Amino acid sequence: MRILLIFFVPSGILDQLFPRISILSTLRVNLTNSPLLTPNLTLYSMVNGFDFSKMFGRKDPELVSKEVKQYNERRFKQMALFYGFTVATFICSKIAYRGVIKRRYVPNYYQHNHVAPPFSFYRDALSAVFHSTSLAITSLGMASTGVLWYYDISSVAEFSFKLKQALGGHDKEQELKKLPEDETVQEIQNSINSYLGDR
């Protein structure tokens, strides 16, 4: 990302702050008549010289390995899912709010405030089911995608593996593999292997 920057700074300060910036043109300007700016300032006009990726410590995309690119794409997909459900939740909440506001009864002058306005049971029930279902689905999706993004989970297999690892199932499985086998179990296993080997 390269942009054009033209600004006023005191002489020598920009070279100390950003030594990697290539200055294409340096002009001396004596601003003696300006009450806001001090005299003897340097006008730096930089074209194709300021790189934000270097400023923020990002590497050149050509130098990044394939694994890092795949990891970045994976995290970007998780983030996109979370923010997509967040926007959907916000939209559904605004729709539900507008639906509730529309049903509000505001009496005019010389009207009773205890008289129920005309309404339809079918329409109210349908709108209530729609609003509650949309809010429940989008909020659940936002919460689940946020948790999956936090724990870096992108598939069902990864979820089952990390859940098994968190509950201690992986360690128990390794302990069971280290235990010596029973003689009867070993005989049954050998007979099954021999039967399958003959066929």
Curated annotation (Swiss-Prot):
The UniProt record lists the keyword Lipid metabolism: no
InterPro entries in alphabetical order: AIM11
Segment forming the signal sequence: none
Compartment(s) where it occurs, according to its Swiss-Prot or TrEMBL record: Membrane
Keywords (A to Z) from UniProt: Membrane, Transmembrane, Transmembrane helix
Regions that span the bilayer: 79-101, 129-151
Record carries keyword Transmembrane: yes
Membrane topology: Multi-pass membrane protein
GO cellular component: membrane; mitochondrion
The family this protein is said to belong to: Belongs to the AIM11 family.
Protein's UniProt name: Altered inheritance of mitochondria protein 11
Naturally occurring in which organism (per UniProt): Komagataella phaffii (strain GS115 / ATCC 20864)
Gene (UniProt): AIM11
